[in-house]
Amino acid sequence: MIQSASTSALRAEYLRRLADKPYFAANLGTHLNLFGQHPASGWAFYLLPGSAVLELRGGSAVLCGELPGGDVGGDAREELRGFLQFLHADTLRSEHPLALDGWRPAAPLALWELPRGRTLPLPPAPPAELMLDKVPSMLPISRLVFPDSDAEADEFYSTACTALAHGVGNCRALLHGRKPVCTVGCYEASPAECYMAAGVTDPAWRGRGLARWLIVSLANELAADRTVRFACFPELCDFYAQLGFLQIGKIQHYSTDWNTQ
């Protein structure tokens, strides 16, 4: 049976199931701690049969842990499928491979890390005309990260500002005048991990090594205290391998179209 993590005991069980799992403990744990007691936030958190937990926001779902095997597992997968359909979730990230009728596997995301206490060689510094801002205004950052979607930019702005206001993570930006042209941040963290995300360069400034320098700079800074991790699509794997990050695993990625079913 799918249970909402709506009590302190169920939220504690949700966090216990995440227990130091790369990517999931930092991401799902941060979101639960920030938004788990605020249903109007748009985030929702559930305990599933077996060792699984589920996070939902809009049309996106994240599954960590495993459903039971055998007939019980078949029933649990069918319940999950119906639940996702009812809530119109059409993308799913999962810790383990998952077979759900009507869901198509996409290329897995690659999970990378810089272990705690390690540093990477710093790429060449950006041009002198750019200024590093360690506490940038998040509104223009949100528009740099999601230039084509006001809704996604607003969601990112809300989540990032909430995290930063609660002392979770950091944002870095390179400014040209007052305009951010490159950014990367950490908006999710666990006691063992800082999760980096939203690394973006303005198209007009690409090809100048800005992201290389900014990503490595922040990763080296964060790795002084915790292991740094992030996920990327397959086409960016060569980029991060060249910088010296270690690939440690994959995150399964699925999608569906309920209009065709």
Language-model segment annotations:
Residues 149-200:
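A conserved beta-strand-loop-helix scaffold within acyl/acetyltransferase catalytic domains
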Residues 1-28, 108-155:
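Short amphipathic alpha-helix that is part of the acyltransferase structural core
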Residues 1-99, 147-151:
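N-terminal charged segments
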Residues 97-107, 212, 234-252:
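Conserved active-site alpha-helix within GNAT-family acetyltransferase domains
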Residues 71-83, 197, 201-203, 207-221, ...:
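Conserved acetyl-CoA-binding loop-helix of GNAT-fold acetyltransferases
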Residues 105-117, 246-261:
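Conserved catalytic-core motifs of GNAT/GCN5-like acyltransferases
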Residues 58-64, 188-197, 206:
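A conserved beta-turn-beta hairpin within the catalytic core of GNAT-like acetyltransferases
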Residues 85-97, 222-235:
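Conserved GNAT acetyl-CoA-binding A-motif
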